[in-house]
From Swiss-Prot:
One of its GO terms (molecular function) is beta-N-acetylhexosaminidase activity. Belongs to the glycosyl hydrolase 3 family. NagZ subfamily. It is found in: Cytoplasm. This is Beta-hexosaminidase. It catalyses: Hydrolysis of terminal non-reducing N-acetyl-D-hexosamine residues in N-acetyl-beta-D-hexosaminides. GO terms for biological process: carbohydrate metabolic process; cell division; cell wall organization; peptidoglycan biosynthetic process; peptidoglycan turnover; regulation of cell shape. The gene is nagZ. It comes from the Bacteria. Substrate binds at residues 62, 70, 134, 164-165. Its main location: cytoplasm. NCBIfam families: PRK05337.1. It comes from Actinobacillus succinogenes (strain ATCC 55618 / DSM 22257 / CCUG 43843 / 130Z). GO terms for cellular component: cytoplasm.
Length: 346
C-alpha cells in the first residue's frame, strides 16, 4: 500500500511527523538542507526516525554533487557532473573519477543509514537552468559512459540508482520547479538523442529506478512525462523493457500543477505508471493526499510495486569513523574536492 515519500520541517523529528510517517500510504521520506546542521545532527535525526517509526522507511536525499548536495559541511565536496568531461582530458581517467565519485557519495550516505540518493542525472546538455552542470555532457555517448561509471561506484557501495529525468530534461529552458516546461522538438530527435542513455543503461540492467520529468513533449503526448501512460507504460516499460521502480519527481513542484490538485496529481501519476510519489514542501497537500488518495490496484500490481520498493533499500552499511580512515576514502576526498574547486574557479 505504501507509495508516498514526504519531507520533514526541521532538524528534529516531531511527533506529528512520526504519525504521518506511520500512515500506511507513506513509503519513506526525503531529506533537505533545512534538515541538516552538521554530520552528528543528521546522523542522530536518521537514527531517531529509524527508532520511532515502527516500519521500514526508505530514507532518501539529493546528494548528486556540485550544486545539488544537501549535506556539505563534514562531507566530501563532490564535483559537478559536467566537470569530469570538461576538466579531465584522458577518457579512462574521466571514467575512473566518475566511479570514485559515485562510490564516495553512496558510501557517505549509507554511513548515515540513508538508503538512496537520487542519482545519476542522465539529461543531455547544460542550457536548461534546472539542469546546467548537473549533466555529465551534451552528447548521449559520453553521458552513457560517465553515468555507467558513476553507477558502478554507487552499486559497489551498496546503493540503488535512479536515472533522471526521463526521457530527458536537458533541452527545455524553463525550470519545472517554477512552471510546466514544453519540449517542442520532433519525437525522432528525442528518441535518437535524449532517450539513448536511459535505453542503454536499462539494457545493461544498471538502473534500479527511473524518475520522469515534469515536461510535456508536445510531439509525443499532451501530459507531462510524470503523468503520461505513453512515456511510462508504452515506452519505458514495454519498448525499453524497464522492470525497476518509477518515482514521480516532486509533485509539489509548479511543473506538476498542470495535472491538477495534489490528490489528482497523485492519482494521475499512479495511473500513468509511477510506483512511488514524491510530495515535498506542501504539508497541507500531504494531509490531503493521505486523507483522500484511494489506491485502486489489483493484488499482482500491488505486490509488484512493493517488490520494486524493496530493491531500493541500501545493501551495505559503512561505519563513518572506519570509512573516513580508509585509504580509498582519503584519496577520493582529496581528488574530488580539488576537482570541484577547479570547476568552481574555471
Amino acid at each position: 500500500m505504501s507509495t508516498l515519500l514526504i519531507d520533514l520541517k526541521g532538524q528534529t523529528l516531531r511527533q506529528e511527523e512520526v504519525e504521518l510517517l506511520e500512515h500506511p500510504l507513506v513509503a519513506g521520506l526525503i531529506l533537505f538542507t533545512r534538515n541538516f546542521y552538521d554530520r552528528p545532527q543528521i546522523q542522530a535525526l536518521v537514527k531517531d526516525i529509524r527508532q520511532r517509526v515502527k516500519k521500514p522507511l526508505l530514507i532518501t536525499v539529493d546528494q548528486e554533487g556540485g550544486r545539488v548536495q544537501r549535506f556539505r559541511d563534514g562531507f566530501t565536496k563532490l564535483p559537478a557532473m559536467q566537470s569530469f568531461a570538461a576538466l579531465i582530458q584522458e577518457p579512462e581517467q574521466q571514467l575512473a573519477t566518475a566511479k570514485e565519485a559515485g562510490w564516495q557519495m553512496a558510501a557517505e550516505m549509507t554511513a548515515l543509514d540513508i538508503d538512496l540518493s537520487f542519482a545519476p542525472v542522465l539529461d543531455l546538455g547544460h542550457e536548461c537552468k534546472a539542469i546546467g552542470d548537473r549533466s555529465f555532457c551534451s552528447d548521449a555517448e559520453s553521458v552513457f559512459r560517465l553515468a555507467s561509471a558513476f553507477i558502478d561506484g554507487m552499486h559497489a557501495a551498496g546503493m540503488a540508482t535512479t536515472g533522471k529525468h526521463f526521457p530527458g530534461h536537458g533541452h527545455v529552458l524553463a525550470d519545472s520547479h517554477l512552471e510546466t516546461p514544453f519540449d517542442n522538438r520532433p519525437s525522432a530527435v528525442i528518441f535518437e538523442r535524449d532517450i539513448r542513455p536511459f535505453q542503454r543503461l536499462i539494457a545493461q540492467n544498471k538502473l534500479n529506478a527511473v524518475m520522469p520529468a515534469h515536461v510535456i513533449y508536445t510531439d509525443c503526448d499532451d501530459q507531462p512525462a510524470s503523468g503520461s501512460k505513453y512515456w511510462l507504460q508504452d515506452i519505458l516499460r514495454r519498448k525499453l523493457g524497464f522492470h525497476g521502480a518509477v518515482f514521480s519527481d516532486d509533485l509539489g513542484m509548479k511543473g506538476a500543477g498542470f495535472m491538477g490538485d495534489f490528490v489528482t496529481r497523485s492519482e494521475k501519476a499512479l495511473s500513468a505508471g509511477c510506483d512511488l510519489l514524491l510530495l515535498c514542501n506542501e504539508p497541507d497537500g500531504v494531509v490531503q493526499v493521505l486523507d483522500n488518495l484511494k489506491l485502486n490496484e489489483s493484488r499482482p500490481h500491488f505486490e509488484a510495486r512493493q517488490q520494486r520498493l524493496k530493491t531500493l533499500f541500501k545493501k551495505k552499511s559503512f561505519n563513518w569513523t572506519e570509512l573516513t580512515q580508509t585509504e580509498k576514502w582519503l584519496k577520493n576526498t582529496q581528488k574530488l574536492t580539488a576537482l570541484q574547486a577547479q570547476w568552481q574557479s574555471s
